[in-house]
UniProtKB/Swiss-Prot annotation:
GO molecular function: ADP-glyceromanno-heptose 6-epimerase activity; NADP binding
Signal peptide segment: none
Residues annotated for substrate binding in this entry: N168, S179, H186, F200, D201, G202, S203, R208, Y271
Binding residues for NADP(+): 10-11, 31-32, 38, 53, 75-79, 92, 143, 169, 177
Protein name: ADP-L-glycero-D-manno-heptose-6-epimerase
Catalytic residues, chain numbering: Y139, K177
Cofactor remark: Binds 1 NADP(+) per subunit.
The EC number(s) this enzyme carries: 5.1.3.20
Cofactor(s) the protein requires to work: NADP(+)
Amino acid sequence: MIIVTGGAGMIGSNIIKALNDTGYRDILVVDNLKDGTKFANLVDLDIADYIDKEDFIANIIAGDDLGEIDAIFHEGACSSTTEWDGKYMMDNNYQYSKDLLHYCLDREIPFLYASSAATYGGREEFIEERQFEAPLNVYGYSKFLFDQYVREILPEAESQICGFRYFNVYGPREGHKGSMASVAFHLNGQINRGENPKLFDGSQDFKRDFIYVGDVAAVNLWFLKSGVSGIFNCGTGRAETFQAVADAVVDFHQKGAVENIPFPEKLKGRYQAFTQADLTKLRAAGYDAPFKTVAEGVKEYMAWLNRTA
């Protein structure tokens, strides 16, 4: 059995799809379906069972026998970069992850988890080393602190621990994310409502490393198969502008002209204007598959999104 926490979320459900595509279906999904709309991410997937996050955490803390576990993909977290309840964030992202990590270490279960490029903050180099890490928000801090915790354990660990610093992930199964959904998702919605797509002032200068969620799932499955441990950037190694995303969406729809809107005051000083994954460690680990460009990934995503709308 493989356990996927956050399995009804965007990355978790895409990992399940990738597992299904290999013929694997013995999957336990852990999530919180208080937001019932997330069920839609699981409808076309084959899983063995579902358990609520709180019940699962209780099982983990109690050390319950959950059966034979081949691996845990830990994608469940509060991923809102605008959430400032630090106690909630640390309980949900840090303590929960520690409890799960120790459960896996005690049983030598491979543990693959979601970190984030938010650990880097406003730096201009994105290398998986302490001197490049300075998160801008409590979400980024919660991810950074768990990475630090993992670094202390890695040298002595007798089973796989692998963290992925996801950059700007976009693609299928993110419709439940609201304001945290990708720019491509929002621009598509604006065009479908008969509006012009909107970008913040300065978007031609903001560059991010946008990675297609199918590529993220492929990275996760490759590392499980390889057994490699460590903390790795999960991006394309290319920084592309928000304008490039908008151009790809407009190109798909063949209509709409980009409008600029004022940059929100609440994001000033807390916004990553530039991200670009350094892939040196990822490639050195042996992962050599190519990553979709924005033009390629957004085109595929738009076809999926408008087919399922």
